Amino acid sequence: MMIYAYSELYLNDAQIFLAKAFDYALNDCQQSPDWFAPIFARSSICRQLEMGSPSIISGKAGEEAVKELLESIIPGEDFPSSSFHQGRSPAYWAGWALAYNQWYTRKRFKDIFMRVPLSEILSMYKLYHEMDLTNFVTDLDIRYNAIILETK
C-alpha cells in the first residue's frame, strides 16, 4: 500500500489551492515562474501545504496566501485582486498537477523546483493537460531523476 503525503480527502482542495495560487501569482501579479516558484517553495505556506494542513488547504484561498507571501517580500507593493479567467491557464494546470505530484510522490516542492523549473513544467501543459495526471507524474519523475545535484 502506498503512503501518500496526506489523506486523499484533502487532495482536491490542495489541488485547487495551488492551482489558484499559481494562476494568481503568474497571471494576475505577472510574476516570473522561475522567480516565484523558489520563493513559494521556501515559504511556511508551502511547508504546511506539503503536510496537508487543513488550515492552509481548506482554510485559505490560494490567491490570498500568495498575496500575503508577496506582500511580505515586496512591502508597499499594491497587488491586484484576483481576476476571473475563462478556462484553465497553464499556470492553473501546473499548480493542479504539481499538488497531485507532491501528494503522490511526497517530494518537497523545493526539491522539485531545484531540478525542474516551473517554466519547464508550464511547457508541459500542451502535452499533458488533457491526459491522466499519472502521465505527468511519470514524466516529471524522469526529468527529476535525470538531474544530479552537486553536493558539498
For the regions a protein language model found, what residue spans apply to each?
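Short, hydrophobic/amphipathic alpha-helical patches that form generic packing surfaces
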Residues: 19-24, 42, 71, 92-103
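Short, surface-exposed acidic
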Residues: 31-38, 77-82, 109-112
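Glycine-rich, aromatic-bearing surface loops/beta-hairpins
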Residues: 122-152
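Intrinsically disordered, low-complexity tails and linkers flanking structured cores
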Residues: 109-116, 143-145
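A structured, charge-rich N-terminal accessory region that forms the first stable segment of a protein
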Residues: 4-5, 9-12, 88-106, 116-128
